[in-house]
Amino acid sequence: MEIIAVAEQTVLVNQNVLFTDTVTCGNCSISHRSGSGLVTLRGITDQCRARFKVSFGGNLAVPTDGTVGPISISLAINGEAVASTTAIVTPAAVEEYFNVFTAIFVDVPRDCCLTVSVRNTSEDDILVQNANLIVERVA
């Protein structure tokens, strides 16, 4: 599944990037509601677990009324940011965009569900544009 949000959006501290359009639909083990920041992964498998690769790419900036400094974004599982997926940039001015990318493998136990999202882990609000989230069932 590939979901995107092309338009610039302000993402508040500890909130999720919202995805508005589905470019490529997933299968029955991946679901997303348009306008939501959550993707549900389902452990539909005969094995012990289902494995997914979750990749995010997008452009980040400090809003016009924000304070210039480091900004960051992370992938989150069930609402908890995964530290190893944190992408950090330090713009020199407001509305100066940087491109970031991060990815993770997520194992979902058989017959369970997890949610994944892209979370603003900065100390201030951020701008996100051309957000692209790809979720692939790999095993």
Predicted region positions:
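Extracellular jelly-roll beta-sandwich "head" domains, especially the C-terminal globular C1q domain
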Residues: 1-139
